[in-house]
Swiss-Prot record:
GO MF assignments: magnesium ion binding; phosphoenolpyruvate carboxylase activity
Gene this chain is encoded by: ppcA
NCBIfam families linked to this entry: PEPCase_arch (TIGR02751)
GO BP annotations, alphabetical order: carbon fixation; oxaloacetate metabolic process; tricarboxylic acid cycle
Protein name in the entry: Phosphoenolpyruvate carboxylase
Signal peptide (UniProt feature, chain positions): none
SUPFAM superfamilies on file: Phosphoenolpyruvate/pyruvate domain (SSF51621)
Species whose genome carries this gene: Pyrococcus horikoshii (strain ATCC 700860 / DSM 12428 / JCM 9974 / NBRC 100139 / OT-3)
Family per record: Belongs to the PEPCase type 2 family.
Length: 469
């Protein structure tokens, strides 16, 4: 059973979950959240995010102890999955040893499951490796885990580790590469092909980011590169006869994938070859539970289809240049407003792909959810940046493979402030948006213009649009 729905801990919600002890989720609340996602919402996988977040490493023990009836009927590791996202030591030096601790924790979780199920069941047997850029990074994680397992035969003073501490299980784990940059996305097919040649896995799961590519290169480029990567994966699957199951990391706004309960059919149409779709915090908590459950059922009932073929248009580079030029103009405004965007998860001081603050084209910017929230809060949805670089014909050509392009732009344009755009020096963008004759939400835009002036209510705006960031 390969999951269709992965619940994640991305903090893009404005509502506080009913079970939360604090607006900032962490610790015990995330244990409850995992059970809620499995038992109520119908998710068949929960990401457990060790990458830059404070999470409970005894999650398996606590889930089995607190909800024994549910997990006797729904076996963790067979019917349901718990999948850690681990730090990538090639990039995250400050968190590197946490990878070792997390891999050791997999064997400990298996011990708890053995006692609970009276059987050798591995509740965790896969890890997500963020910011993957090479085959070597994947193989290192495999090899490190094998070294941990091989310790069982080592003699410590007068006894083997196996006799003293017990056997290490599972013997092998799967590594799920998470591709996040343009270069990584576009060479993902080659990396996967090499990996299959070396490891000969029964199947492979591959994770494609949608949010960070959008922040780095713009919405249209992000969709283009992710779709090209999905096409490459399909080709490798056909060549090698190895089943490959793509995962896509989608959030609520179109900029981050457009995954909202009322929009799931469009997301399925946009990414038909994806096996596993993420549902993030806004999806779970900013909508009526019945709507969330229904949307999850729609995804789980839909069969995968072939990926869409496409050629990357040459003019996409010019769009990226314009997008990044506009980011430079907006960076001071983003840094000013981001302090007003509330936290929704407990985070460590994070050293990620671009550090705690993402670095885009030499600019220091917040992480993507707060980045998105900041721009929406001043009436400049990030979906629209760089749009003025493209002609109508060029947009039409993109819409041939980006099926929801015009719907996504129409959604974002409802929250666009012509006044703010012209005030910050984005007159050309303002003129381009006017050509679409958008149906502007006047109440929203008035409040966004107040926020731009240092007043206004950013959470009122989040409620109107339906997500934080």
């Amino acid at each position: 059973m390969i999951p269709r729905i992965m619940s994640t801990q991305h903090p893009d919600n404005y509502s506080i979950p009913f079970f939360a002890s604090s607006p900032i989720l962490g610790g015990e609340d995330e244990i409850t959240e995992a059970f809620y996602a499995f038992s109520v919402l119908g998710a068949d996988e929960q990401m457990w995010d060790f990458e830059g977040k404070e999470v409970d490493e005894f999650v398996v023990k606590k889930l089995l102890e607190r909800y024994p009836t549910f997990f006797k009927e729904n076996i963790l590791g067979e019917d349901l999955r718990l999948t850690p996202r681990v730090p990538n030591p090639s990039v995250e030096k400050a968190e590197a040893k946490l990878l070792l601790e997390t891999l050791q924790g997999i064997t400990r979780a298996a011990d708890y499951a053995r006692v609970f199920y009276l059987d050798n069941i591995a509740p965790i047997f896969e890890v997500i490796l963020p910011m993957t850029t090479s085959l070597a990074e994947m193989l290192r994680v495999h090899e490190l885990y094998r070294k941990i397992v091989s310790l069982s035969g080592e003699v410590i003073y007068d006894v083997t580790v196996k006799e003293w501490i017990g056997e290490f299980y599972p013997k092998e784990i799967n590594v799920i590469p998470l591709f996040e940059t343009k270069v990584a996305l576009l060479k993902s097919g080659r990396i996967i092909r090499e990996y299959i040649g070396r490891k000969r896995p029964e199947y492979l799961r591959v994770f494609f980011a949608r949010s960070d590519p959008a922040m780095n290169y713009g919405l249209l480029s992000a969709v283009t590169y992710v779709k090209k990567a999905l096409e490459q994966v399909g080709e490798v699957e056909e060549e090698t006869s190895t089943p490959i199951y793509p995962i896509i990391g989608v959030g609520s706004p179109p900029f981050r994938g457009g995954m909202r309960p009322e929009n799931v059919k469009k997301v399925l149409k946009e990414y038909p070859s994806v096996q596993t779709y993420t549902i993030q915090s806004s999806f779970k908590y900013d909508h009526p539970t019945k709507d969330v459950v229904k949307a999850v059922e729609i995804v789980k009932s839909k069969k995968r289809e072939a990926p869409d073929p496409l050629d990357i248009p040459e003019f996409i580079q010019l769009y990226e240049i314009e997008y990044q030029k506009q980011l430079k103009i907006l960076a001071p405004y983003i840094r000013n407003i981001v302090t007003r965007i509330p936290d929704r998860r407990k985070r460590k001081l994070h050293i990620g792909l671009f550090g705690y603050s993402r670095n885009v084209g030499g600019l220091s910017l917040p992480r993507v959810i707060k980045f998105t929230a900041s721009l929406y809060s001043i009436g400049l949805p990030p979906e629209l940046l760089g749009l003025n670089e493209l002609s109508d014909n060029q947009l039409d050509s993109i819409s041939e493979y980006y099926k929801n392009l015009y719907d996504d732009l129409e959604f974002a344009m409802r929250f666009f402030s012509f006044k703010v755009a012209e005030r910050v020096g984005l007159r050309e963008l303002s003129e381009k948006v006017k050509e679409f004759k958008p149906d502007i939400d006047d109440e929203y835009v008035r409040e966004a213009e107040l926020v731009f002036r240092g007043q206004g209510d950013v959470m009122k705006l989040a409620q109107i649009r339906g997500f934080l960031g």
